[in-house]
């Protein structure tokens, strides 16, 4: 049939359009445009019917799936026998897992371990066990900072609606379901390798054998991600291809017929998917292998495009939410790009040339997705893949698999093998982290405008088509357009005339970002931070939570900010400077500004030492100084000299004018400090007050409010914080003076956006803000 080869690809594209249109209705217009292009290009009625049917099917499928994605439970305390649905993860004194209720609803459960002895006992809990659990249901947190990971949305797309804070685990019985037997085997391999492997090897070997990256060090994993080689630590088509080809060869050599070998492999693949964690890349590779094997059984020669389109459609039929997963998108985008460009590889005769083309096309195919989800890519991703892919394929991957098999046969020989293998892994990890540490290799782009991203994706497709046709004229035109769009994506923030002030929701602490129009000044005032206490060794976490890593750096990255023009620290309390070292070590700061007398204790010196090590200029300021940071100007109102009796009253107090409004930023200033500011500046006024010390009763005096006459007060405080900030007396005072109050603990990140001295307050995450959004 004419154009028959287009049926499955067009059906897959229409399925994508249907799900996207159901989730984001304006996408329906793109589908109409898509149908018009098919009509003009092919005039093939049957193809249009197939596309339309696929679109309607997946539109309805997503709508029905989403409407049924609700919970039958309410917030409160529940006790019943639940099934442990995943391998429990123990990190320090916390155990986390998914549990399944008697009516098959799944929850994200977490348990605080009480003692080292209990921790040892919990290691024996297996997936599939039924345990009597008692705990409280709480709603998962939404992302309250732009760019940060949205845990609520992540769970929602797994049909999970609750966090279950478990207080008691009792009477666990053995699993019976076969699926859980496979998961128990996976857990056994993880525990087995944890106990016998050297630290550097453990995480890498587990990632390559069972698809678990939990024990890969955070620094190493981040480095792999920055350089665009993190796919090496995922079970992918390469692993599945090598495994199926190897097993097929062994079975043929053992005298098993090709048909029986294919059937055995078809039975084996689902087990392998469960054993390796069922990540999108594994599902895609296993399904494609299954299509090839099934085709061989019925004497049907399956084309690669057919296999990948069938796999894509089947996965979306089972779970349309897959479409919105970064891993799913990357796996299929790269595979589609390589399959559609297969004729290019055949024209290149040398292995090095083919490796170069494969790396280049994979990079091009993944680039729009990388920019959308992660806002950055490495310019040396192609050469790094050319170097690392063969090395992992022929050395690290076989070594990891062989080492685990050897370890299971003989612990002594296995340890001997891993003693040298660990040296190799350590050397590779150091190489990767050192290269990733070179900032010049990373290109960072602000969250792309949808129109520019769509245009960029289209130009990449046209560029790949031009490469395949070997048309120099088309290649020059599409390559030029592609580079132009890429350049526009890169400079887009510099073209924007919008400025901003953001009070970032970092819990019980302070962190404010001030950005001038056209990126002419990017300043962070304080970093927030969590109080750390010394604890027993068994409570120490392998992956401790970091506001800098999980909140501030993603926030800056989403804005395309590779480096701040200045980091201003108001005073040396942990909840204001706790993440400064992380920002400095990630090369995020050009200039560090501190108040006079910043160091009052030996521990306060740590931040300054980190700045010196990174070559960051340190500037000490006092009352009367004016900070000029490109187009941003800050007037220093306090301190004149440090207050030996109070760190809070030694806070750096700043006054600025931006977006047509005057702002006073008070750090943790208390009433005594406020009085001193009024004495020195008796005519000081401010439209916006950043309330001192998170709204404690020791700050924000009546005289200060009467003097400033603010219209808006911003309070940064943690949700349900132990200090009960902000204090009711402060809130009542602000209410008496008819001052609008915006709070991070209730509203999330508080945003002020302005153009030409006219601005608007809003909050993140956005919702009906008619009561707080107001144009200046």
Swiss-Prot record:
Induction, as annotated: Expression activated by ComK.
Membrane topology field: Multi-pass membrane protein
SMART domains named among the record's database cross-references: Lactamase_B
GO BP terms, alphabetized: establishment of competence for transformation
Gene3D superfamilies: Ribonuclease Z/Hydroxyacylglutathione hydrolase-like
Annotated Gene Ontology cellular component terms: plasma membrane
Cysteines engaged in disulfide bonds, as pairs: none
Transferase among keywords: no
Top-rank taxon, per record: Bacteria
Phenotype when the gene is knocked out: Destabilization of ComFA.
Alphabetized UniProt keyword annotations: Cell membrane, Competence, Membrane, Transmembrane, Transmembrane helix, Transport
Function text: The comE operon is required for the binding and uptake of transforming DNA. ComEC is required for internalization but is dispensable for DNA binding.
Family listed: To H.influenzae REC2, N.gonorrhoeae ComA and E.coli YcaI.
Annotated PANTHER family: DNA INTERNALIZATION/COMPETENCE PROTEIN COMEC/REC2, RECOMBINATION PROTEIN 2
Protein name, per record: ComE operon protein 3
């Amino acid at each position: 049939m004419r154009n028959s080869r287009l049926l499955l690809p067009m059906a897959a594209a229409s399925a994508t359009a249907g799900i996207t249109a159901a989730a984001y209705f304006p996408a329906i217009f793109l589908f109409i445009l898509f149908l018009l292009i098919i009509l003009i290009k092919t005039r093939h009625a049957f193809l249009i019917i197939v596309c339309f049917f696929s679109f309607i099917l997946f539109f309805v499928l997503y709508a029905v799936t989403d409407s049924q994605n609700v919970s039958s439970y309410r917030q409160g305390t529940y006790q019943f026998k639940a099934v442990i649905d995943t391998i429990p993860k123990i990190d320090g004194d916390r155990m986390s897992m998914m549990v399944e209720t008697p009516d098959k609803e799944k929850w994200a459960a977490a348990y605080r371990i009480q003692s080292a002895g209990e921790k040892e006992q919990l290691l024996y809990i297996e997936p599939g066990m039924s345990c009597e659990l008692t705990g409280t249901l709480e709603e998962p947190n939404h992302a309250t900072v732009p760019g940060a990971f949205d845990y609520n949305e992540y769970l929602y797309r797994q049909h999970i609606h609750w966090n279950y804070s478990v207080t008691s685990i009792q009477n666990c019985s053995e699993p019976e379901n076969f699926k859980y037997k496979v998961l128990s085997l996976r857990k056994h391999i993880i525990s087995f390798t944890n106990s016998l492997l050297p630290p550097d090897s453990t995480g890498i070997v587990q990632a390559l054998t069972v698809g678990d990256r939990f024990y890969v060090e955070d620094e190493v994993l981040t480095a792999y991600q920055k350089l665009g080689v993190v796919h090496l630590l995922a079970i992918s088509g390469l692993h599945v291809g090598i495994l199926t080809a190897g097993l097929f060869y062994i079975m043929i050599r053992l005298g098993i017929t090709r048909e029986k070998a294919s059937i055995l492999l078809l039975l084996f693949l689902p087990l392998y998917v469960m054993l390796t964690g069922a990540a999108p890349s594994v599902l895609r590779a296993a399904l494609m292998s299954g299509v090839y094997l099934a085709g061989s059984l019925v004497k049907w020669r399956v084309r690669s495009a057919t296999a990948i389109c069938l796999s894509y459609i089947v996965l979306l039929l089972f779970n349309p939410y897959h479409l919105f997963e970064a891993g799913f998108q990357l796996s299929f985008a790269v595979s589609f790009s390589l399959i559609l460009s297969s004729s290019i590889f055949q024209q290149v005769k040398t292995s090095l040339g083919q490796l170069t083309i494969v790396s280049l096309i994979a990079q091009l195919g993944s680039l729009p997705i990388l920019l959308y989800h992660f806002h950055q890519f490495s310019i040396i991703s192609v050469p790094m893949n050319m170097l690392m892919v063969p090395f992992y394929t022929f050395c690290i991957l076989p070594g990891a698999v062989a080492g685990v098999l050897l370890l299971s046969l003989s612990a002594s020989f296995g340890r001997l093998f891993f003693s040298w293998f660990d040296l190799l892994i350590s050397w590779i990890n150091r190489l990767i982290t050192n290269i990733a540490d070179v900032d010049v290799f990373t290109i960072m782009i602000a969250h792309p405008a949808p129109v520019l991203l769509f245009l960029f994706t289209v130009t990449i497709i046209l560029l790949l088509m031009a490469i395949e046709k070997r048309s120099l004229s088309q290649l020059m035109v599409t390559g030029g357009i592609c580079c132009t769009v890429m350049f526009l994506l890169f400079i887009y923030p510099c073209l924007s005339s919008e400025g901003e002030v953001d009070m970032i929701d970092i819990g019980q602490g302070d962190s404010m970002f001030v950005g001038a129009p056209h990126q002419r000044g990017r300043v962070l005032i304080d970093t927030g931070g969590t109080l750390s206490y010394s604890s027993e060794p068994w409570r120490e976490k392998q992956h401790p939570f970091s506001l800098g890593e999980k909140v501030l750096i993603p926030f800056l990255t989403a804005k395309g900010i590779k480096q701040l023009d200045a980091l201003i620290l108001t005073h040396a309390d942990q909840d204001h400077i706790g993440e400064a070292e992380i920002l400095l070590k990630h090369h995020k700061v050009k200039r560090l500004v501190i108040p006079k007398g910043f160091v009052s204790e030996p521990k306060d010196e740590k931040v300054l030492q980190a700045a010196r090590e990174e070559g960051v200029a340190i500037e000490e300021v006092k009352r009367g100084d004016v900070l000029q940071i490109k187009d941003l100007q800050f007037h220093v109102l306090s301190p004149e000299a440090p207050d030996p009796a109070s760190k809070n009253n030694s806070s750096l107090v700043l006054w600025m004018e931006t977006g047509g409004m005057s702002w006073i930023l008070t750090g943790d200033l208390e009433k005594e400090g406020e009085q001193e500011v009024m004495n020195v500046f008796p005519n000081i006024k401010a439209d916006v007050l950043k309330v001192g010390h998170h709204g404690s009763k020791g700050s924000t005096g009546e005289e200060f409010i009467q003097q400033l006459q603010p219209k808006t007060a911003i309070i940064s405080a943690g949700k349900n914080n132990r200090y009960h900030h902000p204090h009711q007396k402060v809130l009542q005072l602000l209410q008496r003076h008819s001052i609008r109050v915006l709070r991070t603990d209730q509203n999330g990140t508080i945003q002020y956006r302005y153009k030409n001295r006219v601005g608007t307050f809003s909050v993140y995450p956005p919702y009906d803000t008619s009561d707080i959004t107001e144009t200046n």
